[in-house]
Curated annotation (Swiss-Prot):
One of its GO terms (cellular component) is cytosol. This is Serine--tRNA ligase, cytoplasmic. It is an enzyme of class 6 (ligase). Its EC number is 6.1.1.11. Coiled coil: none annotated. PROSITE patterns: AA_TRNA_LIGASE_II. It comes from Arabidopsis thaliana. It comes from the Eukaryota. GO terms for molecular function: ATP binding; serine-tRNA ligase activity. Belongs to the class-II aminoacyl-tRNA synthetase family. Type-1 seryl-tRNA synthetase subfamily. Disulfide bonds join 213-244. ATP binds at residues 269-271, 285, 358-361. It catalyses: tRNA(Ser) + L-serine + ATP = L-seryl-tRNA(Ser) + AMP + diphosphate + H(+). L-serine binds at residues 238-240, 292, 396.
């Protein structure tokens, strides 16, 4: 969430900056004034509580003095009792006022960076880079889609997966499992060489911690709830969530920064808002593996923006190593999630549909997440009036099943699929996956038959 001081003109800040950011997000501008009003109400109640406490201390001293003089203090004692009651009631008002303020504050997104293209429609994301040579079907070879290629190679069993796990369930099988592990091992090795520390996080999180890492809408549309003895928990939708909370309630000394983590995990998503989109094959599924870059920097100068460029370069170098054509887009302001000040997507080329599709999202969340999680910058000082928070960034390296789909389409041949050279050492030296089933083609009557 944002720093409440940004809403306070008396602190030398300009709330109009927040209003403008909200306009860029196509979100409520009125909420800024609502927060300013709630903040004033909360501080007024807090002032009243402080006044009660000062009065209580004053009365207590009077009681002590009267007792020393062995004089009657009963009237003053009655006043202290009334003060306690009034103070308790006012403290309840303070808690209520703060809860209302915090609830509103959490609805305001991060400040949108000036370089973000302002638009509401993702169709207008700004293309900033193209890499690689796009492949197209030729008269001699009609390129197949990833759904058909998975079936022809026999690398996943979606029929039995759906029978056992429900819609979009699947088994990775044989070379499919090996290819998935090859991507994981290549990705982790790739990041280790770039100074990243590997972390495999828990696959579920406590609700109170998840609430500090995920938006409210994600609980309904994305997260699976795990019930059992004790507190409710939620399955992670990305390693970003547990990595985000890894340093919760800690102070991080400047000498420790930057921190670079390579999170590897299975991920679980309900995908409630994606009915009818990519429901076949293994492109958009409820359970998948992902390697996530997660980095923490200091809040000063351009440290986090330089890290954003570094993380984006890592992703580009990874897909260049796989020789998959891609484009980089800057996401429009209206499509940013609340935490992101700026976000890039890397979209790779899928030849069968002749379109680019998202494989990577890379965001700078500045101090928005760290403030909620109380991950502070520097070292604790007893006399410090203001706290600084670290900046946190996240980026996909590879969601492996989705990357496999892209590899299959770009590396297909008439009789199978080549294995990218960088993955071959992780595949026992295999260089080619032959089709195990015969391709399906249309016969002269328009019906499908085996070739």
């Amino acid at each position: 969430m944002l720093d409440i001081n940004l809403f306070r003109e008396e602190k030398g800040n300009n709330p109009e900056i927040i209003r403008e950011s909200q306009r860029r997000r196509f979100a409520s501008v009125e909420i800024v004034d609502e927060i300013i009003k709630l903040d004033k109400e909360w501080r007024q109640r807090q002032f009243e509580v402080d006044s009660f406490r000062k009065e209580f201390n004053k009365l207590n001293k009077q009681v002590a003095q009267l007792k020393i003089k062995k004089e009657d203090a009963s009237e003053i004692i009655q006043q202290t009792e009334k003060n306690k009651q009034d103070s308790t009631a006012k403290e309840a008002e303070v808690r209520e006022a703060y809860a209302a303020l915090k609830a509103k504050l959490e609805q305001v997104g991060n400040l949108v960076h000036d370089s973000v293209p302002v638009d509401k429609d993702e169709a207008n994301n700004l293309v900033i880079k193209l890499w690689g040579e796009k492949r197209f079907s030729t008269p001699g070879l009609k390129l197949k889609n990833h759904v058909d290629l998975v079936e022809l190679l026999g690398i996943a069993d979606t029929k039995r997966g759906a029978e056992i796990a429900g819609a979009r369930g699947f088994f990775l099988k044989g070379d499919g499992l090996m290819l998935n592990q090859a991507l994981i091992n290549f990705g982790l090795t790739f990041l280790k060489k770039r100074g990243f520390t590997g972390l495999q996080p828990p696959f579920f999180m406590r609700k109170d911690v998840m609430a500090k890492c995920a938006q409210l809408a994600q609980f309904d549309e994305e997260l699976y709830k795990v019930t059992g003895e004790g507190d409710d928990k939620y399955l992670i939708a990305t390693a970003e969530q547990p990595l985000c909370a890894y340093h919760i309630d800690e102070w991080i000394h400047p000498t420790e920064l930057p921190l670079r983590y390579a999170g590897y995990s299975s991920c679980f998503r309900k995908e409630a808002g994606s009915h009818g989109r990519d429901t076949l094959g293994i492109f958009r599924v409820h359970q998948f593996e992902k390697i996530e870059q997660f980095c923490i920097t200091g809040p000063n100068e351009n440290a986090s923006w330089e890290m954003l460029d570094e993380m984006m370069k890592n992703s580009e170098d990874f897909y260049q190593a796989l020789k998959l054509p891609y484009q980089i887009v800057s996401i429009v302001s209206g499509a940013l999630n609340d935490a992101a000040a700026k976000k890039y997507d890397l979209e790779a080329w899928f030849p069968s549909s002749e379109t680019f599709r998202e494989l990577v999202s890379c965001s700078n969340c500045t101090d928005y997440q760290a403030r909620r999680l109380e991950i502070r910058y520097g070292q604790k000082k007893s006399n410090e009036q203001t706290k600084q928070y670290v900046h946190m960034l996240n980026s996909t390296l590879t969601a492996t099943e989705r990357t496999i789909c892209c590899i299959l389409e770009n590396y297909q041949r008439e009789d199978g699929v080549d294995i990218p050279e960088v993955l071959q050492p992780f595949m026992g030296g295999e260089t080619f996956l032959p089709f195990k089933a015969k391709p399906v083609v249309a016969d002269t009557k328009g019906k499908k038959s085996k070739a």
